[in-house]
């Protein structure tokens, strides 16, 4: 475990130079230790950092652009400098994607389903988050969380995950900010129009939880982070529930939503 802590410290230093493509939460506060039992810390020794969400004992959901070599997945972590007895580490056994082209990760299908090499055990600091059973509603209050940058562009990283609240916004608000964004995608637009709160470098792949439901995966957004009238883009999890459930059930040839 000492090696893990050393790697974590090196990772924080290396991430000082990361771009938002590996999107901490700006404008938030330290998460309550009991509110992120499903949150996975995903990284490798090269310094690439993402988050993920445990959806059952054997599967983690994250962003496709978080794919990396030598990936390690840590569960039950709160403070990177303090070890808990129930922390668990896994590596991917299999990875599943919906991508048809590299451009999909920008505008659509930025989703990766990971089967772990062995099931994790539920504990005081580890428990899965269910998939959504309803689509998100416009204006919903949503929770974001992660170990990413808490300042931008001069990035500072925290050893604990930060949490904050944002809202689901009309899709047109994101189209107005990001030129070339298609008229329809499987993306959620979410943020605070006045700025000051946002996901940022190191948060990619983490959950967007709206009214208690896992509705989005942190995908990408404008950099520097947390600027006014620059909401973030999140993969809409509800649209992929059939695909996810089919893969988990063993139907590895399941079709992604068009």
Curated annotation (Swiss-Prot):
Disulphide-bonded residues: 31-163, 50-66, 98-256, 142-210, 174-189, 200-225
Pfam entry (one): Trypsin
Residues annotated as signal peptide: 1-18
Residue numbers annotated as active site: 65 (charge relay system), 110 (charge relay system), 204 (charge relay system)
GO cellular component: extracellular region; secretory granule
Keywords noted in UniProt: Blood coagulation cascade activating toxin, Disulfide bond, Glycoprotein, Hemostasis impairing toxin, Hydrolase, Protease, Secreted, Serine protease, Signal, Toxin, Zymogen
GO annotation terms (biological process): proteolysis
PTM comment, free text: N-glycosylated.
Residues glycosylated per entry: 44, 79, 103, 121
Enzyme class: hydrolase
Cited SUPFAM superfamilies: Trypsin-like serine proteases
Name of protein: Thrombin-like enzyme CPI-enzyme 2
PANTHER family in UniProt: KALLIKREIN-1, KALLIKREIN-RELATED
Principal localisation: secreted
Protein task: Thrombin-like snake venom serine protease that cleaves fibrinogen beta (FGB) releasing fibrinopeptide B. Promotes capillary permeability-increasing activity through the release of peptides from the beta-chain of fibrinogen.
